Structure formats: structure tokens, C-alpha cells
UniProtKB/Swiss-Prot annotation:
Lineage of source species: Bacteria, Bacillati, Bacillota, Bacilli, Lactobacillales
Gene3D superfamilies, alphabetized: 3.10.20.590, HUPs, Isoleucyl-tRNA Synthetase, Domain 1, Valyl/Leucyl/Isoleucyl-tRNA synthetase, editing domain
Keywords: Aminoacyl-tRNA synthetase, ATP-binding, Cytoplasm, Ligase, Nucleotide-binding, Protein biosynthesis
Catalytic activity: tRNA(Leu) + L-leucine + ATP = L-leucyl-tRNA(Leu) + AMP + diphosphate
InterPro entries: aa-tRNA-synth_I_CS, aa-tRNA-synth_Ia, Leu-tRNA-ligase, Leu_tRNA-synth_edit, M/V/L/I-tRNA-synth_anticd-bd, Methionyl/Leucyl_tRNA_Synth, Rossmann-like_a/b/a_fold, tRNAsynth_Ia_anticodon-bd
UniProt organism field: Lactiplantibacillus plantarum (strain ATCC BAA-793 / NCIMB 8826 / WCFS1)
Classification via PROSITE patterns: AA_TRNA_LIGASE_I (PS00178)
Protein name in UniProt: Leucine--tRNA ligase
């Protein structure tokens, strides 16, 4: 009978659900393995075929490790707050809570249909008050430690998006929001921020202790951007002595080459330093660049722009006057928001100096045409007074000493990383548990009153004040304490990154009402052994989660410094036209359709066989057909037309499959460990091909093969396991072992030559000696044919390789 995927997959999914097959116990007498997927945002579109790739990888590892005797934690949940639900609610009038619940139901149905071995008793949802109670609790601990603060911050403000909201730098493209294309402006606004910068050094240094792709580590290092240099203070001509411009430079040794200064247009001193003659030009320039994101402003390929303020800085090392400009390539958020420009030795400064005809002063010796380019190489210092003749590092050290002695600067470590802007002007997010009182005091909502619940409302229209829609709910916003003091709740909500920064901890103990998770359980399960998800989260989610985890470690809440020991980024499944799948391109493949037509096991097998897990590969319907045919081929190998185990599966073992079976167990085990699933599948295909060539199939090998296959094709394997006479699920069957001695052939093929030319071959015992080899060669028909009529002069036998008959 043909393999009926619909009946068989439904049968085993029901069995797993009813028997809670994948329920995880918090036992400590077994080794643990924690396999985690980046939990999805439950969008209205549901899963696409890209989602199951990563989920299948973690599921294979989870099933594999269970059979190896590990206690496996493999959970799933929902990152369910976020902008799309709120936008949909505004557009349609639906409540985001109901919309999200409906989407989760659909996602869960789809995920169950793919046979993933999640423990659904541990499901978490970031929008559940019992979950975000602890998100709020973490915020309160950050606040108590001085790591959550409110300040006037320059933000990307999109006034027409959701009635006005802040978006991150990563969400801005060409002065517009990535989602929706709304205009973005840089404006100062009171925002909550988290002091991630306090953890900058640890976030860099501890990358050495985790098994992550090197490119992700490098992205995090670059994002944090640690650099060592000097803080240098410049007086301003015509200004009081206490008016100083502070500059951070990694090359203080080039101070003699500074020929102008540049401030970010948003720098606090711009207004004070702008002369009346330059005021209009400065104002116009600031308006012009207001909609540019930081990424656009620092684009190396863009044309340099700027305006002179009319003021001059004083170079502390030689007293020279340096014109002070503003330009958008200097960011208020990086360093001090001011630079000393050394155009002879910096490409951006050189371009700017050339455009505005500013002096270019070489201070490092090198063969260079300064009419054409800056010299950015190393060399001895020239035109540099007391550092003349010195190489780079000695000159830096000497200059820093000089600055310190003259109270004009000191050594400093700087970071590109900025504090994390933590507030959003949206409804659908975790309320920030803060009250602002009429007397100016700000307090936290008492811990015993958490969670501060997000109030239900039908009015999601913008407040009109730049605040979130929560500002419209008077009876929620306005509070009075026991002394009659009036206050207002914080109306901004947390960003979507909040709930995803600690969810992996809640899976360990999801129903705990007294703590975010029990410490002893965390000690058993932490850290996550395998984390699989997209590389696009390199510098946001993954950095934020590491920051929160380190903070919780410092509090004594978690036992490890790092949350995720091993990270794997699955590649992208592209459309069959090699483009990214998207609704607009019309190339999205719905997994529901594939499961219905071919079955979940076919989809799982195909996605793992497409290529290396990390590679981005186009979808191929032909490849899908091939995977489906192989599933049926495995079925036919073992099961006859009457749905019974074939008679050729027997206890008899004639040894014909011994070597290939042991090779297959060894190779598949090693390839699973290394997550080379495509290569493991290739080896299983080789075994099936060999199995079709023999008359008898030893049941011990067939059962072993079914175990090897089960992590990838669990429904097929459960059915075969059952038909082979087993009452229990294959889930906890013992992983097969191999015999190293069986991997070595007893026989070897040797070459038979006449006068050095190959004339024949022979299969011989591996340990056959020289005398026997000579006799065998001389008795070979082909050798006799080529030596007929000739005299054999010599026979050279090399055991295990060849016999050469010399004749003439």
C-alpha cells in the first residue's frame, strides 16, 4: 500500500499531543540539552516555508539528543507585542489583542502540523500579563540600579506614523520609515533609556567565551565600537574660558595637523558659537538635514556638506585658530559630537577640506600627492614639534602625557554604542511601571502591584501630543496617592525588544508566580545549548538579550554570564526566482500547501537536504518531488502492498550490509552533531540504495536505520517503528551505535599488471601474502593472455596493492 502521509501524520500528531510525549521534566539525574528557536512574531500572514528551516534544525537536534539519553528542553512561544498588530487595529477597528490571539492560534496549528517536538506546557506569550509582570520587574531593577533613566534625547521622529512615534536608526531608510515610508525627522524628546553602555566592555570581552559565528561576533564588536584615544579640550576665541569644545580622537598624535573643527548640527554649543552673520545659513542647514538618519549622514560615498559658524577654536598644542564648522557627517550621538579635522590623514576630512578650500597640513611622513588624496598610512611624524621623528604609538603616548600636563586632555576609551532608547509612543506594548507626580517626583509602581496591566480600549487613535494612545485613557493615566498627591502614569510603552530579551529564561519555569524563574531550575538548564535564528538579529535582539542577562547575573537572578552558548544562523529560503520571498513578488510558498500535498516529513527532509543549513538557497519544486519520492522509497523498502513488514526483513544477518550500516550510523551521528543534515541525508540514501540490492534485511539494521531517520522524518519513522512491532514511541528509543571494527573491509581490490600496465583486477583477502599473490596473478586469465609466448622473468608482489608480472 502506498504511503499515506495525511493519515499517518495526523495519527502521530494526535498521539504525541494526547500522550504529552515531549513534556520536559525538571530532573537533574540526566545531562540536559536546551534547544531554542527565536520565537516568532505571530503575523497575520502565518508561517512561510522559511520558518520551518530553523525550527526543523532545532527539532532534529532535540529528537537526536533525547535518543542519546539527554533531558531536552525544546519550547515555543510568541513575541506578540509590536507595531503591525496596532497598525492593523487602527486600520480595521479590530482589537490588537483579539487579532494577535487569532494569529497565534493559526501559527500554533501550522507548527503542530509540521511535527515539531515542542513542550507546549511551557508556551509563553509576551502579551500575557503573567509574563510581562516580569518584564516590568526587570525594568524596575534596572531603574533601581541607575541603569534606566529619562532624558532629553535626539530621536528619529515619524509624525505621520501611528500619529507620531519614535523609530530606531535601523528602521530609517533615505529619511523615511522602512515600514510605510513615512517622513522621519531628528528631534529632541524626553525618552526612557537603558544604560547598555555600562556593559560595553563585558559585551565585547565575553564574546570570546561563546560558540557563535565569527561574523556575528564581529558585527557586535563593531556595533559597540570600542576605541582607545584621548579627550582633547579646545578653548574658543572670543568666548569665556569655561567655554570648551571637547573632542575624542584615536589619533591625538596628529594634533599639529588639525586645520579646522566640525560640530554635529545638534551640538549644544552651536547656537552660542554661531555669529550673527552666519545665523541664517546655520538655521537653514539644520532644517535641511533634520530628516536624515545617522546611517545616511555617515555614508562615506555621499557628497560632504557643511556651514561655517563664524567662530574659531584654539589648538592647545600650538595656539593656532581653527575655523569651527557644522556638518552632518559628525553625529551628536557619537563621541562628543565634535571633531578636530586632520584632512592630510583622514579621507572624510580631506574631502570636506577640498570642497571648502580649507588648509591641508601633512604631519606624518609618506609618499603622497596631497592634491589627490589623504595619506592614511603610518610613518614618522613631521611638522609636529615635540613628537617629530616618532612612530605612531610613541607619539600618541607622548601627546597624551603633554595634554595631561597642560590640563588640555587625557587618555580615554570611547564607544560607538549608545544607550538603548526604551520608550515607544504606541499602545500595543508593555506599560512602563512609572508614575510622574505633580511635585516633580518620579516613582516606580510598587512590585506587589505588578503587573501594571495594559488597559483595554477601543480608542487607539494617536493622542495628538506625541504621547501614546494610553494618554487618552484618563481613568488609567491619572492616579492619586494616599496623601492626595496627584500623578500621571507613564504613557510610553516598551519596545518589542523588551519581551524577547529574557523569554528563554521563562521557558525554564513558565508558571512561577514568585520569580521570573526558579534559580535552581535555571542552574540546571542554563545556558541555552543551541540557539537558531536569523542573522538579521545580530546587533539588536542578540545584544539586548546579552545585556539583560548580564544585568540579571549581577543581581544573582541567573547563574551564567551568557545566555546562549552556541548560535547558528540558518540561511534564507529564496523564491524559485532567487529573490527573497515576499507577498509583493508573489513568490511566497505556504507550508500548509506543501504539508497537504506532500506531507510534513517531505518538507522537513527537503529543507534539510537543500544544502548547508547556513546557506541561502532558492526553493525548487523538483527538489521537493525528489524528497517525496525518497520518503516513499524508504516506505516500500520495508512495507509491502498489504501494509505489512516485508518478509525480507529478518533476524538472519549474512553480513552484506554490515559495513555500510556501521558506516551510516557513524557518519549520520557525526553529521547530526555538526548539524550537517544534508550530508547525513546523503549517507542514509546510500544505505537505502544498498539495502535494495540484497535479499535479506537484518532487522537490527533496519531498526537502527529507522532511528537514524526519525529526527528528520518523525511521522514516517514512528509508523515504521510501530509496524516493526514496538508499542512505545520511537522518541526515547536508544540511539544506535556502531562497531569500529566493522568499518574496515576484510578484502581489498588489487591491480594485476604485465610490464607495468594494468591488465586485470582481483578481490583478495586483506592479509594475503606475497607467495599467494604471485600464484593468483599467474593464474589470472587476462595475465595469462598477455604473457602467452613470453618468458616470465620476475613477479613483483606488493600486498594490499598490486602484482606486476615482468615478461618478454
Amino acid at each position: 500500500m502506498a504511503y499515506n502521509h495525511k493519515v499517518i501524520e495526523r495519527k502521530w500528531q494526535h498521539y504525541w499531543k494526547e500522550n504529552k510525549t515531549f513534556k520536559t521534566l525538571d530532573t537533574t539525574d540526566k545531562k540536559k540539552y536546551y534547544a531554542l528557536d527565536m520565537f516568532p512574531y505571530p503575523s497575520g500572514q502565518g508561517l512561510h516555508v522559511g520558518h520551518p528551516e530553523g525550527y526543523t534544525a532545532t527539532d532534529i537536534m532535540s529528537r537526536f539528543k533525547r535518543m542519546q539519553g539527554y533531558n531536552v528542553l525544546h519550547p515555543m512561544g510568541w513575541d506578540a507585542f509590536g507595531l503591525p498588530a496596532e497598525q492593523y487595529a487602527l486600520k480595521t477597528g479590530h482589537n490588537p489583542k483579539d487579532f494577535t490571539a487569532k494569529n497565534i492560534k493559526n501559527f500554533k496549528r501550522q507548527i503542530r502540523s509540521l511535527g515539531f517536538s515542542y513542550d507546549w506546557d511551557r508556551e509563553v506569550n509576551t502579551t500575557d500579563p503573567s509574563y510581562y509582570k516580569w518584564t516590568q520587574w526587570i525594568f524596575e531593577q534596572l531603574y533601581k540600579k541607575g541603569l534606566a533613566y529619562e532624558s532629553e534625547t535626539l530621536v528619529n521622529w515619524a509624525p505621520d506614523m501611528m500619529g507620531g512615534t519614535v523609530v530606531s536608526n535601523e528602521e530609517v531608510v533615505d529619511g523615511k520609515t522602512e515600514r510605510g515610508g513615512y517622513d522621519v525627522y531628528r528631534v529632541p524628546m524626553k525618552q526612557w533609556s537603558l544604560k547598555i553602555t555600562a556593559y560595553a566592555d563585558r559585551l565585547i570581552d565575553d564574546l570570546d567565551d561563546i560558540d557563535w559565528p565569527e561574523n556575528i561576533k564581529e558585527q557586535q564588536r563593531n556595533w559597540i565600537g570600542r576605541s582607545v584615544g584621548a579627550s582633547i579640550r579646545f578653548k574658543v576665541a572670543g568666548q569665556p574660558d569655561d567655554t570648551e569644545i571637547e573632542v575624542f580622537s584615536t589619533r591625538p598624535d596628529t594634533l599639529f595637523g588639525a586645520s579646522y573643527m566640525v560640530l554635529a548640527p545638534e551640538h549644544d554649543l552651536v547656537e552660542q558659537l554661531t555669529t550673527p552673520e552666519q545665523a541664517d545659513a546655520i538655521k537653514a542647514y539644520k532644517a535641511k538635514i533634520a530628516s536624515k538618519s545617522d546611517l545616511e549622514r555617515t555614508d562615506l560615498n555621499k557628497d560632504k556638506t557643511g556651514v561655517f559658524t563664524g567662530s574659531y577654536g584654539i589648538n592647545p598644542v600650538n595656539g593656532e585658530k581653527l575655523p569651527i564648522w557644522i556638518a552632518d557627517y559628525v553625529l551628536a550621538s557619537y563621541g562628543t559630537g565634535a571633531i578636530m579635522a586632520v584632512p592630510a590623514h583622514d579621507d572624510r576630512d580631506f574631502e570636506f577640506a577640498q570642497k571648502f578650500d580649507l588648509p591641508i597640513k601633512p604631519v606624518i611622513a609618506g609618499d603622497n600627492d596631497y592634491d589627490q588624496q589623504a595619506y592614511t598610512g603610518d610613518g614618522e611624524h613631521i611638522n609636529s614639534g615635540f613628537v617629530d621623528g616618532l612612530a605612531k604609538q610613541p607619539a600618541i603616548d607622548k601627546m597624551i602625557d603633554w595634554l595631561g600636563e597642560h590640563h588640555a586632555g587625557e587618555k580615554k576609551v570611547n564607544y560607538r554604542l549608545r544607550d538603548w532608547i526604551f520608550s515607544r509612543q504606541r499602545y500595543w506594548g508593555e506599560p512602563i511601571p512609572v508614575i510622574h507626580w505633580e511635585d516633580g517626583e518620579t516613582t516606580l509602581v510598587p512590585e506587589d502591584e505588578l503587573p501594571l496591566r495594559l488597559p483595554a480600549t477601543k480608542n487607539l487613535e494617536p493622542s495628538g501630543t506625541g504621547e501614546s494612545p494610553l494618554a487618552n485613557i484618563d481613568d488609567w493615566v491619572n492616579v492619586v496617592d494616599e496623601n492626595g498627591r496627584k500623578g500621571k502614569r507613564e504613557t510610553n510603552t516598551m519596545p518589542q525588544w523588551a519581551g524577547s530579551s529574557w523569554y528563554f529564561l521563562r521557558y525554564v519555569d513558565p508558571h512561577n508566580r514568585e520569580a521570573l524563574a526558579d534559580y535552581d531550575k535555571l542552574k540546571y538548564w542554563s545556558p541555552v545549548d543551541l540557539y537558531v535564528g536569523g542573522a538579521e538579529h545580530a546587533v539588536l535582539h542578540l545584544l539586548y538579550a546579552r545585556f539583560w542577562h548580564k544585568f540579571l547575573y549581577d543581581l544573582g537572578v541567573v547563574p551564567t554570564k551568557e545566555p546562549f552558548q552556541k548560535l547558528v544562523n540558518q540561511g534564507m529560503i529564496l523564491g524559485d526566482n532567487h529573490e527573497k520571498m515576499s507577498k509583493s513578488r508573489g513568490n511566497v510558498v505556504n507550508p500548509d500547501d506543501i504539508v497537504d500535498q506532500y506531507g510534513a516529513d517531505t518538507l522537513r527532509l527537503y529543507e534539510m537536504f537543500m544544502g548547508p543549513l547556513e546557506a541561502s538557497i532558492p526553493w525548487s519544486t523538483d527538489g521537493l518531488h525528489g524528497a517525496n519520492k525518497w520518503i516513499e522509497r524508504v516506505w516500500r523498502l520495508m512495507i509491502d502492498e498489504n501494509n505489512r513488514v516485508r518478509d525480507r526483513i529478518t533476524t538472519i544477518n549474512d553480513g552484506k550490509l554490515t559495513k555500510i550500516y556501521n558506516e551510516t550510523v557513524k557518519k549520520v551521528t557525526e553529521d547530526y552533531e555538526a548539524m550537517r543534515f544534508n550530508i547525513a541525508i546523503s549517507q542514509m540514501m546510500v544505505f537505502v540504495n544498498e539495502a535494495y540490492k540484497v535479499d535479506d534485511l537484518p532487522i537490527i539494521y533496519i531498526e537502527g536505520f529507522v532511528k537514524l531517520l526519525s529526527p528528520i522524518a518523525p511521522h514516517l519513522s514512528e509508523e515504521l517503528w510501530s509496524l516493526l512491532g514496538h508499542d512505545d514511541t520511537i522518541t526515547y528509543a536508544t540511539w544506535p551505535t556502531y562497531d569500529e571494527s566493522k568499518l574496515v573491509e576484510d578484502t581489498v581490490q588489487i591491480v594485476l599488471q604485465v610490464n607495468g600496465k594494468v591488465r586485470s583486477h582481483a578481490e583478495v583477502a586483506k592479509d594475503m601474502g606475497k607467495d599467494e599473490l604471485e600464484k593468483l596473478a599467474l593464474a589470472d586469465e587476462k595475465i595469462q593472455e598477455f604473457t602467452a609466448g613470453k618468458t616470465v622473468r620476475k613477479v613483483i608482489a606488493i600486498p594490499g596493492k598490486l602484482v606486476n608480472v615482468v615478461a618478454n
